From Swiss-Prot:
It comes from Halalkalibacterium halodurans (strain ATCC BAA-125 / DSM 18197 / FERM 7344 / JCM 9153 / C-125). GO terms for biological process: galactose catabolic process via UDP-galactose, Leloir pathway. Its EC number is 5.1.3.2. It catalyses: UDP-alpha-D-glucose = UDP-alpha-D-galactose. This is UDP-glucose 4-epimerase. NAD(+) binds at residues 11-12, 31-36, 50-51, 72-76, 91, 116, 140, 144, 168. The keyword Kinase does not apply. Disulfide bonds: none annotated.
Length: 334
């Protein structure tokens, strides 16, 4: 049986595909390549298309014996979602509705969903627990929460089995340097800092240094992308054993401040990396850390690469060899 990975050419998706292949899984990838990269994929059956394409989904489910879907395909920028909410509901919610409808038509009833800790909104406690209130503060988080609720009701009505994985910031790259992180425009802190080290940016901005944290900068939960890949695989195995459906946080066990991330990047790269203090961004909480006790207990998941230094080292190794990301590879493959 095969696993269909939607959005499998994206950052977390491509690392999950690589991890699945290393476990001996047969993998089918569907991606529209708006954000993903063909150069991040090898040795898989690839479909270039959209999750809202009914006919394409029929073809995929008819052609391949698929027992589980891992669903990454989504628009995922918080700021953009505030400016373009219709697009986010269209792609994320309606897209998932189309995917789910076709899954059920073809009797595929297991799905692992890449959700987000943005479903919680402003945290009521740190670390965040799955039982905490889910009150998203932006359309991106709202769409992910709506999808989670859709899965719940489809379980009640049709026997769908699902795992929703909620996490904050993926970081790092394949430890062997085969694939890495490439967004356009780049919005994630670690690759932005590494672009400064590569001379592609003059400096990095620290948005606020007057938070109630030890060094005044925001604290965030970073998880190595291969640890996230492993979590998605373990979730598939959990569902194949008829494990309970539900939502699971994935956390590193501790958070890292913006200043701490920059300092570790300086140490790893050997570059000074100039930084400047900028005004706070609206809606940025001082600290966001997720508890992963439930995932550890039920899924058997433990981070293999919890060290910030290791995440930065793996990211730096890839960025040094691919300073312009997948641009060359994409031109060759598309």
């Amino acid at each position: 049986m095969a696993i269909l990975v939607t959005g499998g050419a994206g950052y977390i998706g491509s690392h999950t595909v690589l991890f699945l292949l290393e476990q001996g899984e047969q993998v089918i990838v569907l991606d529209n390549l708006q954000k993903g990269h063909a150069g991040a994929l090898s040795d898989v059956t690839f479909y270039h298309g959209d999750i809202r394409d009914d006919q394409l989904l029929d073809t995929i489910f008819t052609t391949h014996s698929i027992d589980t879907v891992i669903h990454f395909a989504a628009n995922s920028l918080v700021g953009e979602s505030v400016k373009q909410p219709i697009e986010y509901y269209e792609n994320n919610v309606i897209g998932t509705h189309t995917l789910l409808k076709k899954m059920l038509e073809h009797d595929v009833k297991k799905i692992v969903f890449s959700s987000t800790a943005a479903t919680y909104g402003e945290p009521v406690q740190i670390p965040i627990q799955e039982s905490d209130p889910t009150i998203p503060t932006n359309p991106y988080g709202e769409t992910k929460l709506a999808i989670e609720k859709m899965f719940h009701w489809c379980q009640e009505a049709y026997g769908l089995q699902y795992v929703c994985l909620r996490y904050f910031n993926a970081a790092g790259a394949d430890p062997n340097g085969r694939i890495g992180e490439d967004h356009s425009p780049e919005s994630h802190l670690i690759p932005i800092v590494l672009q400064v080290a590569l001379g592609q940016r003059e400096r990095v901005a620290i948005f606020g240094d007057d938070y109630q944290t030890e060094d005044g900068s925001c604290i965030r939960d970073y998880i190595h992308v291969m640890d996230l890949a492993n979590a998605h695989y373990l979730a598939c195995e959990h569902l194949r054993k008829d494990g309970q459906s539900g939502s699971f946080n994935l956390g590193n066990g501790k958070g890292f401040s913006v200043k701490e991330v920059i300092e570790v990047c300086r140490q790893v790269t050997g570059h000074p990396i100039p930084a400047e203090i900028a005004p706070r961004r609206s809606g940025d909480p001082a600290s966001l850390i997720a508890s992963s006790e439930k995932a550890q207990t039920i899924l058997g998941w433990e981070p293999k690469y919890p060290s910030l230094e290791t995440m930065v080292e793996h990211a730096w190794n890839w960025h040094k060899e691919h300073p312009h990301g997948y641009s060359t590879e994409n031109k060759d493959k598309q």
